[in-house]
Amino acid sequence: MGSSGSMVKPISGFLAALIQYPVPVVESRADIDKQIKQIIKTIHSTKAGYPGLELIVFPEYSTQGLNTKKWTTEEFLCTVPGPETDLFAEACKESEVYGVFSLMERNPDGGEPYNTAIIIDPQGEMILKYRKLNPWVPVEPWKAGDLGLPVCDGPGGSKLAVCICHDGMFPEVAREAAYKGANVLIRISGYSTQVSEQWMLTNRSNAWQNLMYTLSVNLAGYDGVFYYFGEGQVCNFDGTTLVQGHRNPWEIVTAEVYPELADQARLGWGLENNIYNLGSRGYVATPGGVKENPYTFVKDLAEGKYKVPWEDEIKVKDGTIYGYPVKKTIHS
C-alpha cells in the first residue's frame, strides 16, 4: 500500500484520502460482504495512519464490483439506506470521518436499479444521497438518477457534491454542483484505462470552470477483462493538479484542501470568474451584465427538446450491442 500527498490536517481546511481500491471480482453475495468488511477495515487503518484525516473516498463499484452478468440481480443489489450503509455509518462514526461510498441501489419502486453514491458524516448520519444522472451507456444498465445533484456541508468549511464516473464528462454536471454552492466536487469512478487521459482532463476543467476543488478517484488493478487506472487526482480551483496518484491498487492519495480559498476566488476574482460571468455577460458595457440565455441547447434541454443536428443518423441508441434487449426489464 503506497501513498502520495499530505500527511497532516491543515489548521484551516481539511485532509482528504482517496483510496485506489482494487477492482473487486465479485461472484456472490458473500463476495460483496467481503468487500464491505474490507472497506470498513480500510477506513480504520487509514485513519490510524493519518490521525488528522477528515474525509475518505472510495471509488465507484468498490462495494459490489462489475460482474455484468449479475450486477442487476436481486442478490447483488442493496437498499439505500439499508444494512450495508448502516455498517459504513458505524465505521465512519468510530473513526470520526466523512466517508463517500458507492452502491448499486435496488429501485424502491420496483424498476431498474440505480448507481448511487452516499456521504456519511462523523456522527454516522447519511447526509447526501446521489443517483448517477448519466449512466455510461450503452455499457451500464442503470436508470438515470432522479435526485438531482444535492450539496451538503462537509469538513473545513466545504460544501460537498458527488458525481459518478461518466457524470464528470459533462461540464453541465460540475456547473450544477457549483451553481448550488459546492466548493468541492468529488468524483468516484470505475473507468478502465481507455479514458484515463480524458478523465484527468475533465477533472481539471471541472475545477477551473467552476472555481472549485475536484477530488477524484478510480478503481485500480485488473479484473481479468480490463485494467483500471487508479490515478487519484486532487485539482485546485485554478485547474492545476495538486496531487496525482499512480496506477497502483491500494495507493492512498491524500491532500490538504482549503475550501475557503475557492470561496475567496469566487468573491474576489474579476477575470476568469466564469461561473458568475456566465449569467452576467458583458457587465462592463451593460451594468449588471446581460442575463438572458443565449444558448439554444440550454433552452431546448429545459423544454425537453434537446436534439443534435445529426441525431437521426446516430447508430447506437440502445443497449443491444452489450446484450440488453430493447424494452426488457432488467431488474430481477
Swiss-Prot record:
Pfam families named in the record: CN_hydrolase
InterPro entries hit by this protein: Aliph_Amidase/BUP, C-N_Hydrolase, C-N_Hydrolase_sf, Formamidase
UniProt keyword terms in alphabetical order: Hydrolase
Enzyme class: hydrolase
Domain CN hydrolase: start-end pairs: 14-259
Catalytic activity: formamide + H2O = formate + NH4(+)
Gene3D superfamilies: Carbon-nitrogen hydrolase
Active site positions, chain numbering: E60 (proton acceptor), K132 (proton donor), C165 (nucleophile)
Stored PROSITE patterns: CN_HYDROLASE
Example GO biological process: putrescine biosynthetic process from arginine
Gene Ontology MF term list: formamidase activity; N-carbamoylputrescine amidase activity
EC number: 3.5.1.49
Purpose: Is an aliphatic amidase with a restricted substrate specificity, as it only hydrolyzes formamide.
PANTHER family (alphabetical): FORMAMIDASE, NITRILASE C965.09-RELATED
Protein family per UniProt: Belongs to the carbon-nitrogen hydrolase superfamily. Aliphatic amidase family.
Protein name: Formamidase
Species of the source: Bacillus cereus (strain Q1)
Encoding gene per record: amiF
